[in-house]
Amino acid sequence: MRRKHALKLSANDIERKKIFFQFALMLMAAFIGGLCFVAALDTSISHDVRGKIISSFSGISLRDFDLMQFVRSIITACLPYFVSVLIIFVFSFSYVSYVVSDILLALNSFFTGVLVALVALCLTPAYFLSAAIFIVCTVTSLLVLMYFAYTCALLSLGIRLRVSNGRMIFSGKKLLYATLKTIATLGTFIILTFIRSIALLI
């Protein structure tokens, strides 16, 4: 009996490692794809985009600062992460959790790679600090999304194991834990996006 239980634990550990490796591989591949996409852009397009990004990093005076516009920009920047987190959370109670998480990670990683590559074009001495903070916060947000997707995938794995053992699909404690983790993840995105937006004002 103990040996059977040990084998089951070992199989679960292997499954967890496979999930993490799968998500990490998808994230890196899509991120590199975004970098390569920018590298393949026409030079004139890159130049135009570079000009717009540099103007964004030029900073604004406090006299021209609009608080409501600043808040709206944070909400707009957080929106893709919010939508991704909520979709991953909902589908974590289904059997297609891995597929949905893979797709969303790939999309977010690709666009993050594009954004980082475009901002990296502006890493001149004048805007180095702002651009560096922006890139660090953006990449950190992507890693937070991956970690959240990983924890939701483990929740989905636990549900499948419970169903296979003829037990209740999920307990109220598990649901509360998943909900609190979702709220904490959304809060983390708001903080990172706020810091990223402040970098544009430096």
List PLM regions with ranges.
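Hydrophobic alpha-helical transmembrane segments of integral membrane proteins
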Residues: 101-136, 180-197
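Cytoplasmic juxtamembrane regions at transmembrane-helix boundaries
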Residues: 89-113, 164-180
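Individual transmembrane alpha-helix segments
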Residues: 69-98
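Perimembrane loop-to-helix junctions flanking transmembrane segments
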Residues: 47-69
